[in-house]
């Protein structure tokens, strides 16, 4: 039997705004996310509701918009069996409150033709109940086998260069737990690839893999702790490319290096010698 032909993408969706249902959350939602990205007892400001000035890690920005991103991909005709999360960006305009109601919109801003694959770029904005802009995110999703439709290839990622010979701003090593993907999925990313051993093996992995956004959240958390003095409001933006797979239970080495722009850092992460986050750029106040 011949495999089914890839579905044609609905390019008419490009530029259209999609509304997400209101997202109601409380401190437990935020603490669950913090645990999913490795927070421990020394970070009670992110975990214990009794802490004065309870904090929320900036990576939480992806949580209220996961549904609208999946909806956009479904409407455009992406084949969910072949999706690969390529890049992620967040821009934080104000810290998340410990509880509240969030209203988000999404928009497919571009579809790039990479030949064998298409890259769907989705932008989201999130406002609080008072209408104040809290966060924006950009998701770049590779749709393997759905390129070749005659579109523009789009830009190629360019790595921000660190200052030559400058010492790192910081290095950090974080040990993911064997249960890390099981914890992270409680924040709403329920892709069975991260929990089902049979599925993971069937698509070519040794075991269920860690969510890319979990590794991204670990990195954003480290930036807040090491460069932001533990203040989430100081991380203004963070973008990174997912360059390799992380398995739960492995150790990840992160490095941030200064650039020629004050407050801007080049970021990458490795498992051993293997790059897993690349083209990282963080901006802090």
Question: Model-derived features: where do they sit?
Answer:
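A conserved acidic, glycine/proline-rich C-terminal tail/linker
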Residues: 223-258
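HotDog/MaoC-like acyl-thioester-processing domains
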Residues: 2-13, 83-172, 246-249, 253-285
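Short amphipathic
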Residues: 16-26, 166-179
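A conserved, well-ordered hydrophobic junction motif at loop->secondary-structure transitions
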Residues: 44-63, 172, 179-230, 234
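Conserved beta-strand segments that form the floor/walls of ligand-binding pockets within enzyme
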Residues: 91, 204, 241
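Hydrophobic, proline/glycine-rich low-complexity stretches
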Residues: 1-101, 227
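Short Pro-Gly-centered flexible turn/kink motifs
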Residues: 18, 101-105, 212, 216
């Amino acid at each position: 039997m011949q495999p089914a032909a890839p579905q044609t993408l609905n390019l008419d969706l490009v530029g259209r705004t999609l509304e997400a249902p209101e997202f109601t959350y409380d401190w437990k939602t935020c603490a669950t996310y913090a645990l999913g990205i490795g927070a421990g007892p020394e970070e009670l400001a992110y975990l214990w509701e009794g802490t004065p000035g309870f904090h929320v890690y900036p990576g939480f920005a992806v949580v209220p918009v996961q549904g609208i991103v999946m909806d956009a991909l479904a409407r455009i005709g992406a084949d969910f069996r072949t999706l690969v999360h390529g890049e992620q960006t967040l821009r934080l305009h104000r810290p998340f409150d410990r509880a509240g109601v969030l209203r988000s919109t999404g928009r497919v801003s571009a579809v790039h033709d990479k030949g064998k694959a298409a890259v769907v770029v989705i932008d989201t904005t999130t406002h609080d109940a008072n209408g104040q802009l809290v966060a924006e995110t950009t998701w770049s999703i590779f749709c393997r086998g759905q390129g070749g439709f005659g579109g523009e290839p789009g830009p190629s990622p360019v790595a921000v260069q660190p200052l030559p010979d400058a010492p790192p701003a910081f290095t950090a090593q974080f040990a993911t737990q064997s249960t890390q993907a099981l914890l992270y999925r409680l924040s709403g990313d329920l892709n069975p690839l991260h929990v089902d051993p049979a599925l993971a093996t069937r698509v070519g992995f040794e075991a269920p893999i860690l969510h890319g956004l979990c590794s991204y959240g670990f990195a954003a958390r480290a930036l807040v702790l090491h460069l932001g003095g533990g203040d989430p409001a100081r991380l203004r933006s963070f973008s990174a490319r997912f360059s390799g797979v992380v398995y739960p239970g492995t150790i990840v080495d992160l490095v941030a290096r200064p650039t020629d722009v004050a407050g801007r850092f080049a970021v990458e992460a490795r498992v051993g010698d293997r790059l897993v986050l690349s083209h990282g750029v963080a901006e802090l106040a």
